[in-house]
Amino acid sequence: TSNGVQADSGVVDADVLHSLQLTRAFGENDPLKIIGAAKVKELVWHEDAFAIGFNFGLLTSLVKLDMSVEKASGYRNGSFMASTNGMLLLEEVNMRNNRLARNGDNGNVATLDLSWQGRLKKLDVRGTGLTRVKLATGAPVVQLCLPDTIEELFLEYLTKLSDSGLILEGINNVRGYRYTNCPGIDGFAMLERLHQARLNGSGKLERFVLEIDREDDGTLLKKYYDYGTYTQTGAVDDRHSGLRGKLTLTKYLADEELEKYAARYPELTIKQPPYTMIEFDDSVADDANVSNLDNKTGYKFGNTYKMSGHVNAILSKRHRVLAKVTRMPTSRKVEIAGQQVEVNNPDGEMTYFPLHDESSNFYADAEDMNDCTVAKLDGSEGDWMMYEPFYWSKGINDYLNNKKYACYSSYPEDEMPPIPDATVLTLDAIKETQGGWLGERKIMSGKPTLMESYTTDKAYSVCKVDVSGYRRVRFPSVPGTGLIGSVFADAEGNILKSIVVPTIGLKFEAGMYLIADVPERATALHFSILNTAEFDCVVLSHSDKIEDMEPDWVANEEHLCAVVGSSVVGSKLRACITGASTTASMTWTDFHYYSQQRGMQQIDALMHSRIANLSYAKYGRRDMQEQCGAGQHNNNRTTGGTAEHGMTDTIGYEEASSINPNVTNSLIENSVHQYAWYREKDDYGGATVTQVNNICCLGYEDIYGHKYDMMDGVDLPNDTGNSGKWRIWMPDGSTRLVKGSVSSGIWITAVAHGKYMDVIPVGSVSGSSSTNYCDIYYISTASGRVVYRGNHGAYPYGGVSMSNASYGSSNTSTYIGSRLAFRGRLVRASSAVAFKAISEVA
């Protein structure tokens, strides 16, 4: 000691502990000195009452320090080391229950600073009363034991520390929490514990920092909104909260709510969910079998359906416009329905300017309609069209579970929503695998082994795919006539599971796909295909999300489609108000020709499906005649009855009569009420209705009923092996075939749907005017059929889903019309004045 007492001396062997006896050898004013301290590797000293002046900084070779005591004595409030900067080799420190576990400020602050100990592996300071522990950035700590008095829990860059190595006496005093790059620690789970303690009234958490990359429905943003955080320099910041990194929402948030959270979490990238998902429950006949999985409304949830998210974003971009062809497209020869016709390429151009959403009689060049420029809808200022924006979509059929799904994304064209991981196999790829394809065979279900399941049939083939290790598989199939189907087999060829599409209640066509869970021990799926059916692909997935069984997204291109049917004005077909009704009694060939000469086309099959699907997604039902009304029961309605109401949709009898029980009650075929109504307000703000002859659905006038719309870009060749198949021309000029029903006159109960969400009736089951799709499908299997859509008059079978493929291209009728459309380059004029000054070229 400083007073000359030599307690012990001698030569100590390396790596061998030597005991020093210091009983009554030093006092408070007699600091202890260890001669040769720089050579000490391990020090075990179960003492908490030594002199303040002991200089641990001399122990420069110390690797392990054990100064734990069984019970804290509370003898002194000093610190066990005045300086730790020289103890750079320290790896293990055990100060459990030792109240001297402090450094700096003579121990008056309950802080232990080990920020110089870059090799520290183990630290135990339980029972020490510490409120803060500082560790070296990147220290290889594998065990960290902290007291229940800790107020600042900072877990940063401790890459070796695991959950099992972090031992906390308690968390109720933690006021500040920081977590960064500790892969073995569940930092989010710790935050949840701290938050729950505060909710329970036992915790004191005030601020935190946590880097995340996770999915959430917005609950986290609300939960941690009121907490503070720390700046990058470590300063307290109570104006913002501490979530950082990336949060992908699973529920779409309104723009104003998103802005609020973005301001509170400035270092958190909040990504709206990539899509909104709609579910159709085909096990029920209710036309309103639709559920919005985004906001949990609709049939499945037993409440009123409300559109939201990406559907709302897509619909908000749609507007009525006036448009002019400003560059003629080139064209090519195409045979449609047996006729050689000129078809425009998508290299033309139309320039447009929006009309006010509250009234199409004004341009949308000011918010207040009183300040807007008057628009002329007589054709002198362009064609009256609907601007249909770009969006992403995909459909999923889960036939075996009686479900269909529709996914919508308003992401821009240059940002495709995430593509799920999946193995996709084409028929060619399957044929290239050993035993992958066996011609002139089919699988019969219900047999015990694979070999017993094969039967010869020239119309079919059997495909085999390896399903080992996968969770789900999607594969094309056939109706189960005679128990034909598919089987899962194990490595020995034993049948583990058979799948058959029942022919009773059939809502399926050959080539449509099934989705099935892969049974345990299954190594292969053997499935029957019809040789003349379209083969989409096989999808193998590890995902539990049904939407991941369709890995491809469809880019729905922006285009224009006429708000009203076509009218002859002079020598041209126009979309305009003439004071009379729309044009009829022309052949498909002539309607196509005059539309093409304008640099445009007729409405096509993709547009037909798009309008139907968006109406389902908007209203959560499929019976648009009840939703938006059926209109006047004739085919000679005066065009333009919806102009002064802009994009506002009409309502049907059910809603109108709930406002005014005295509205016209006129049933057509004892099924549907004719006319439509606008919901308005009287002078006192009360609800009232106004009856009109035209319907408005999705902003379109008479998009169903009144007159059929002939369609471009589709026919039914009905040649060998292709009976009932719709041939659809895609915008890039390619074609695809979709098998539809061959049962004419059925009330539609199912549609092809699939990736493109085709509203093409399938199966043989018939519904009614008030169930399922509430519309009828007509078809002829004679060669070269064109397709009409929407029906005529106000017949109960003629809604937004209705189509008619019974006639050839030469048929005419007073109840068959057309509707202009345009695919190509769209240019928005800089102003209404600039638009009016533009001259059309066709």
Language-model features: locations:
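Extracellular ligand-binding interfaces
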Residues: 2-7, 479-513
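LRR N-terminal entry segment and analogous cap-like coil->beta motifs
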Residues: 11-112
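GGW-centered surface loops in extracellular recognition modules
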Residues: 1, 273-387, 393-395, 600, ...
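A structural signal for leucine-rich repeat
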Residues: 56-57, 80-87, 105-107, 111-117, ...
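Short aromatic-cysteine micro-motif
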Residues: 375-383, 413-423, 547-703, 842
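Concave beta-strand-loop units of leucine-rich repeat
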Residues: 45-51, 66-76, 95-108, 119, ...
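C-terminal, surface-exposed recognition/capping segments
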Residues: 609, 630-675, 679, 687, ...
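Extracellular polysaccharide-targeting segments
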Residues: 426-456, 466-467, 498-499, 507-549
